[in-house]
């Protein structure tokens, strides 16, 4: 069980601070510590199901979900485990968290998520969870499981630049995408679709677009950001978008980037807009770039015949 979160039990912590201030130390819940710890998600799922293999939590901001899925896949690929559940969860829509993001000027003031649109003004915070059951091919076939996709490779790098802003040259993101391609044994020309991080912030979308162009040229493969629909699930986002990538393969449709109506003229990408685009499924790259310069990428393939 490898699970991700960005802020853990923030709501519990914030609520108990209010209890402390209003009612005193003796009224603070004894469950505060185990409920606020970031590892609680993986711990509770493993306890509920009696899973005694690896049970770990990844906390790398907005890249955490992608890193968790990648780490889970690695445990299977190396033969350490036959089956690993990888994913992420986030529930941080507390007034204090929202105020903090708003005061950072990271959140949208319009309340609309518009990835790559010229009118974008920040991300729209959301809550959610997603998980993938990852297992060795032979193990899945033996139990008659439906195989939706394969994880072929992953990348993980750091910008080493700023606690919140992406590196403007995009070199950390470029290195991460190239690392994922190398791990998958593919070239840039092999990628048929990119699920972008695409948060709808002015800085992130432009930095990611430039990084994609450096790796894939202009305009590159069809790009979508599902955050136009889901908002930004922070530590869960990468897992949610991995599932979206799998569904794009399964449904043979690239989802449109909701909210992107007027493409930013500085974004030189083939952004899928307005309606879903039918495609012949091929390798998909899913990007996640988080606060602190954490970068994560996954390469997913249609299942072999």
Short names for language-model regions:
Residues 1, 45, 65, 72, ...:
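Conserved small-residue
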Residues 1-60, 89-97, 188-204:
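Conserved beta-ketoacyl condensing-enzyme motif
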Residues 10-12, 91-115, 131, 155-175, ...:
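Active-site-adjacent elements of ketosynthase-type condensing enzymes
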Residues 22-29, 67-70, 74, 78, ...:
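Glycine-/small-residue-rich "gating" segment that lines the acyl/pantetheine channel
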Residues 30-39, 56-64, 226-235, 261-262, ...:
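Active-site nucleophile and cofactor-binding loops and adjacent substrate-binding regions
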Residues 38-42, 46-88, 124-145, 233-254, ...:
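Active-site-proximal alpha-helical scaffold in enzymes
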Residues 112-186, 192-193, 260, 305:
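Condensing-enzyme catalytic core mediating Claisen C-C bond formation in acyl metabolism
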Residues 184-190, 219, 268-305:
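Flexible, low-complexity linker/loop segments at domain and module junctions
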């Amino acid at each position: 069980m490898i699970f991700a979160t960005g802020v853990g039990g923030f709501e519990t912590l914030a609520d108990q601070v209010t209890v402390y201030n209003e009612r005193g130390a003796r009224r603070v819940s004894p469950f505060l510590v185990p409920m606020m710890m970031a590892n609680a998600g993986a711990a509770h799922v493993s306890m509920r199901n009696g899973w005694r293999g690896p049970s770990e939590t990844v906390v790398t901001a907005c890249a955490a979900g992608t890193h968790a899925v990648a780490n889970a896949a690695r445990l299977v690929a190396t033969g350490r485990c036959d089956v690993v559940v990888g994913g992420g969860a986030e529930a941080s829509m507390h007034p204090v968290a929202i105020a903090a993001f708003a005061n950072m000027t990271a959140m949208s003031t319009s309340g609309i998520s518009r990835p790559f649109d010229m009118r974008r003004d920040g991300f729209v915070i959301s809550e959610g969870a997603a998980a993938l059951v990852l297992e060795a091919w032979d193990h899945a076939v033996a139990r008659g499981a439906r195989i939706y996709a394969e994880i072929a490779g992953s990348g993980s790098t750091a910008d080493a630049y700023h606690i919140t802003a992406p590196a403007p040259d995009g070199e950390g993101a470029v290195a991460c995408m190239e690392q994922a391609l190398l791990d998958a044994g593919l070239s840039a020309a092999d990628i048929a679709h990119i699920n972008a991080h695409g948060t709808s912030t002015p800085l992130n979308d432009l930095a990611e677009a430039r990084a994609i162009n450096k790796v894939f040229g202009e305009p590159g493969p069809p790009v979508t950001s599902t955050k136009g629909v889901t908002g930004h699930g922070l530590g869960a986002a990468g897992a949610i978008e991995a599932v979206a990538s799998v569904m794009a393969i399964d449904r043979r449709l690239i989802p449109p980037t909701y909210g992107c109506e007027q493409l930013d003229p500085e974004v030189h990408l083939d952004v899928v807009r307005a309606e879903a685009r039918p495609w012949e499924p091929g390798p998909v790259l899913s990007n996640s770039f988080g606060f602190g310069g954490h970068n994560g990428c996954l390469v997913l393939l249609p299942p072999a015949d």
